[in-house]
Amino acid sequence: MLTKEDVNNAYYSEDSHSFGSKQSLIKHFGKAEKQLIEKALADNDIYTRYHLYRKPKYYSPYYVYRARQLIQADVINFDNKDLVDFNDGYKYLFTAIDVFTKYAWVFPIKKHNCKTSQQCIARIVQESNPLKIENFQSDRGSEFKCRDVINYLSKENINQYYALSDRKAAVVERFNLTIQMLLYKMMDKSMTRRWIDFIEPAMKIYLHRTHRTIKMSPLEAESSHNHQTLREIFMQKYTKANLRKKKPKFKVSDTVR
């Protein structure tokens, strides 16, 4: 018989459902245990402390059809004296994500500049081989809008462009929230300020966890055998998005003021 202790042990393990949502634990234990899981999580200090309510908001999707068609990148700032002193001088996390497969990369860095960004991008290009990155998107931060990065991407024949709307690079921004929440939960559970020790287990959880958008884990999505299934999932999203678009109020040749 399932107990609250079993639920908490599963929540704190390093499996795909660890430090996750209520739904991930229900999927793990079964719908019959939903009530007990809800009660256990309601008494779980880490879960309740970091639980977020998000008001649904509709955005037009990114139109992608293959792996490495679009990579989004960003930098997470951990430049807080209380944290820097405990993390060997590391102040930032360089993050990047494949918008199609949701596969992600994170690299701890000490300096927030053009050279470190170029080095991180080069690692992603190398690890992606033989897949060819086609497009690279980021915000207009100085660490991306600089000579080293621009020249490197040009040399690799990768199209670079910047996010100009208030959404910024929305997919990597959402990934940033996911990885930060995992790191802070693990730090809180272990009562430590060394986030650098939890990068590997946090990424293991993320890469093995079923992603809500693609209905599979990023590791499963990386397999070429699943790319056609991914395309079908995205095409359903695109069809719904097109139906939601407002029809124009005017037609060609209409007289307007």
Language-model regions, residue ranges each:
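Short small-residue beta-strand/loop micro-motif enriched in glycine and branched aliphatics
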Residues: 102-107, 161-163
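Domain-scale segment recognizer with a strong primary affinity
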Residues: 4-12, 27, 35-38, 51, ...
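A short, polar/charged loop-to-alpha-helix boundary motif
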Residues: 114-124
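RNase H-like DDE catalytic core and adjacent DNA/metal-binding regions
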Residues: 1-101, 108-110, 123-137, 142, ...
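Short amphipathic alpha-helical segments
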Residues: 33, 113-116, 198
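Short beta->alpha junction loops
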Residues: 108-115, 165
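Residues that form or flank phosphate/diphosphate-binding pockets in enzymes
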Residues: 116, 144-147, 170
